[in-house]
């Protein structure tokens, strides 16, 4: 099972990137933050809502030096067929993020999200920092999708703590107060709360 503050499990495979097959690997993203999210299956129900939402927000992630990759145990051919299916028919349409094919199930297994009985991954989401260490891990059961806004906020918060060495309180957003992780200095933050 992957651990926070430790190197993310290396991966490599074929993805659909801008409508074509391309080999990608974790090390391609060194120097950038990366959101790697797993979803159960192509041509399903909750999955397209998440993938489309991440794709539509890809530019926001790129503005903060972060890329996003979706991954399932489907083949790259199935990914491409789903991308080429119109959204009004349950397809994805044009994508602004890569969809990684994990037909061998190795990536999902290495990240600890594979349901061994069904061969499909749970909805795992991993934030990997610019040094390729894991900073955040969440895993949802199959019927509930994830929040793109919360994922973006978490990346921003980790980047802030990396840069300034301060900690971010609950519900922190860029521009809001942070605190120094020190019993005395943290009081400056708490004095401003009600």
Curated annotation (Swiss-Prot):
GO terms for biological process: cell adhesion; cell redox homeostasis; determination of adult lifespan; germ cell development; germ cell migration; hydrogen peroxide catabolic process; removal of superoxide radicals; response to oxidative stress. It comes from the Eukaryota. Detected in the head and body (at protein level). It catalyses: a hydroperoxide + [thioredoxin]-dithiol = an alcohol + [thioredoxin]-disulfide + H2O. The active site is at 47 (cysteine sulfenic acid (-soh) intermediate). The keyword Chaperone does not apply. Keywords: Antioxidant, Cytoplasm, Disulfide bond, Oxidoreductase, Peroxidase, Phosphoprotein, Redox-active center, Ubl conjugation. The modification Phosphoserine is found at residue 194. The enzyme can be inactivated by further oxidation of the cysteine sulfenic acid (C(P)-SOH) to sulphinic acid (C(P)-SO2H) instead of its condensation to a disulfide bond. It can be reactivated by forming a transient disulfide bond with sulfiredoxin SRXN1, which reduces the cysteine sulfinic acid in an ATP- and Mg-dependent manner. Conjugated to URM1, a ubiquitin-like protein. The keyword Nucleus does not apply. Its EC number is 1.11.1.24. It is an enzyme of class 1 (oxidoreductase). Disruption phenotype: Results in reduced resistance to oxidative stress. Simultaneous knockout of Urm1 restores normal sensitivity to oxidative stress. The modification Phosphothreonine is found at residue 193. One of its GO terms (molecular function) is thioredoxin-dependent peroxiredoxin activity. InterPro entries: AhpC/TSA, Peroxiredoxin, Peroxiredoxin_AhpC-typ, Peroxiredoxin_C, Thioredoxin-like_sf, Thioredoxin_domain. It is found in: Cytoplasm. Residues 2-160 form the Thioredoxin domain. GO terms for cellular component: cytosol. Homodimer; disulfide-linked, upon oxidation. 5 homodimers assemble to form a ring-like decamer. Also exists as a monomer. Thiol-specific peroxidase that catalyzes the reduction of hydrogen peroxide and organic hydroperoxides to water and alcohols, respectively. Plays a role in cell protection against oxidative stress by detoxifying peroxides and as sensor of hydrogen peroxide-mediated signaling events. Might participate in the signaling cascades of growth factors and tumor necrosis factor-alpha by regulating the intracellular concentrations of H(2)O(2). Reduces an intramolecular disulfide bond in GDPD5 that gates the ability to GDPD5 to drive postmitotic motor neuron differentiation. The active site is a conserved redox-active cysteine residue, the peroxidatic cysteine (C(P)), which makes the nucleophilic attack on the peroxide substrate. The peroxide oxidizes the C(P)-SH to cysteine sulfenic acid (C(P)-SOH), which then reacts with another cysteine residue, the resolving cysteine (C(R)), to form a disulfide bridge. The disulfide is subsequently reduced by an appropriate electron donor to complete the catalytic cycle. In this typical 2-Cys peroxiredoxin, C(R) is provided by the other dimeric subunit to form an intersubunit disulfide. Belongs to the peroxiredoxin family. AhpC/Prx1 subfamily. This is Peroxiredoxin 2.
């Amino acid at each position: 099972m992957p651990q926070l503050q430790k190197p993310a499990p290396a991966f490599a495979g074929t993805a659909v990137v801008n409508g074509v097959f391309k080999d990608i690997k974790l090390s391609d993203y060194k120097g950038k933050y990366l959101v790697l999210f797993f979803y159960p299956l192509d041509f399903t129900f909750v999955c397209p809502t998440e993938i489309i939402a991440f794709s539509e927000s890809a530019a926001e992630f790129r503005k903060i030096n972060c890329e996003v990759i979706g991954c399932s145990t489907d083949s790259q051919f199935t990914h491409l067929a789903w991308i080429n299916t119109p959204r009004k028919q349950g397809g994805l349409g044009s994508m602004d993020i890569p969809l990684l094919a994990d037909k061998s199930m190795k990536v999902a297994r290495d990240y600890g999200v594979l349901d061994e009985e069904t061969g499909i991954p749970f909805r795992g989401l991993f934030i990997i920092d610019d040094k390729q260490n894991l900073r955040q891990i969440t895993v949802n059961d199959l019927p509930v999708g994830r929040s793109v806004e919360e994922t973006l906020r978490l990346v921003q918060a980790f980047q802030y703590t990396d840069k300034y060495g301060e900690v971010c309180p609950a519900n922190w957003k860029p521009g809001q107060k942070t605190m120094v992780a020190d019993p005395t200095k943290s009081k400056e933050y708490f004095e401003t709360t009600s």
